[in-house]
Amino acid sequence: MRLHLTFNHSTPATGRKNTKHTLFFGSMLACIISIISLVVPAYGANVSDEKKAKPFTHDNVIDLAMQLAQKPFKEARKAPKELIDLDYATYGKINYQENAAIWGGTPTKFSVQLFAPGFLYKNLVDIDVVENSRAFPIELTESSFSVPNDTIEKLLTQVGQYAGVRLHYPINDDEVKDEFIMFQGASYFRALSKGQTYGLSNRGLAIDVAQPKGEEYPLFKRFWIERPSKYQTAIVVHALLDSQSVTGAYRFGIYPGAPTRVDVDVTLFPRRDIAHVGLAPLTSMFLYGGLDTPDKPDYRPAVHNSEGLQIDRGNGERLWRPLNNPNKLQISAFGDEDIKGFGLIQRHRNFDYYQDLGANYQQRPSAWIEPLNDWGKGQLILLEIPSNAETNDNIVAYWEPQGGLKQAEPYRYSYRITASNDSPSFTNKARVIRSSKGQKQAKGKELLIDYSNIKPQDIEKITIDASISKGKILSSRIVAHPEINGARIFITFEPESTNVAELRIQLRKDEKPVAATWLYRWNSDDWP
């Protein structure tokens, strides 16, 4: 839409300024400018002209996903080989021009920057901005990126598409728009709260994880980003997901802050029956810490993006499972119905626990998943994959619905992701803050667990309910731990004629749980 405005304004013949008329004209002009700002896009650089704009609502994404599911899967367009062959260092020199940021020079608190294709990011994606219920494609031009050489600039311009998107907002400083969420690679995305640095990742969907035929990685192939008004502190991103087995329409309501929250609504259209599908998947890294000690000398006491899995079961029970870096692939399943929440948690928030000046693991976010509609029966799956490097993601957690997904039936799921420092449901409650191997025993193995937020006067009233699936609990005791305003328990156990045993420990007071039930899988390969 183009608006042509003509004003015929003349000064009175007397030469005196007509103040009343001028004030009226100024007010009228201000109103017209305000109206223009509502109907004319203020997107910034690299957005196509209005002739390419199309009406848009989330229903359009659902319709696209439904239509796509009725057609055979078609691989996404790939970046040219020259870009894919770039090494990490060269790709890292390709940066989106800050002065090209979408909405960067407008009153909107948010701005949008984009990722170039290349290196690991082979798939090309389309990105639109939505203003006044119309979608405008963002076009890649020679001014979109700063690049290390002319060859790369030419290749990017010829490609004309991007590999992902990141959003900026004054989350830490009112005067600085920091990156706080990114979508890049397959269906991966990561979010930050105030004061955090990137760690674990979220994914749109997981299919056939750890199955013999190999995992399938769905792709967000197109994004639509709604422009907020200058007063809004939230933003909406829509995404179209596609893979060999399923299509999906996603809506992300994103609320940056302390903590950042992402409300996800997804409608899935399976192309085939899918037995093993993962909802709200989380991917993280655990190298060592707590019960798991390093294989070789390291000045850092712990190295991980997440240290534990927390589950709030449908029956009200809370579970805490310390993570492990096993010698062999380890898969755990926690059956449930109407699960209340789950997450991978980074609980320790002090530098001394990690001693890493570069990685700052104490600033890595936790991710808490809270279903907002009925997820029914299923199981929470935890994968722990052997790893010898902190650059490898080796922890995966997701909800697997019972019965999987059936072909041609639509499925709708809603959930909330909170990028908190801890799980929201554990605020001001007794919680496990340390799990460790104890001293060497003449008989059995000693386990030590520290709990915070337990009053000294309650210690004598607490009982320890400890069990092992194969073996015996030899002893258990609890003592006050004034350094953490909590308690420390010691458990001695003896596995019998087995390589694997499940430990379960619960503190109770007046027959009621004091804290989350502590779970752990003892393995003779990891703890001889």
Curated annotation (Swiss-Prot):
Alphabetized GO MF terms: carbohydrate binding; catalytic activity
Highest taxon, organism lineage: Bacteria
Keywords: Periplasm, Signal
Main location: periplasm
GO cellular component, one term: outer membrane-bounded periplasmic space
Signal peptide location: 1-44
SUPFAM superfamilies: E set domains, Galactose mutarotase-like
Annotated family: Belongs to the OpgD/OpgG family.
Segments forming a coiled coil: none
Protein name: Glucans biosynthesis protein G 2
Localization annotation: Periplasm
Pfam families for the chain: MdoG (PF04349)
Pathway: Glycan metabolism; osmoregulated periplasmic glucan (OPG) biosynthesis
Source organism per UniProt: Shewanella oneidensis (strain ATCC 700550 / JCM 31522 / CIP 106686 / LMG 19005 / NCIMB 14063 / MR-1)
InterPro entries: Gal_mutarotase_sf_dom (IPR011013), GH-type_carb-bd (IPR014718), Glucan_biosyn_MdoG/MdoD (IPR014438), Glucan_biosyn_MdoG_C (IPR007444), Ig-like_fold (IPR013783), Ig_E-set (IPR014756), MdoG_OpgG (IPR023704)
Role according to the record: Involved in the biosynthesis of osmoregulated periplasmic glucans (OPGs).
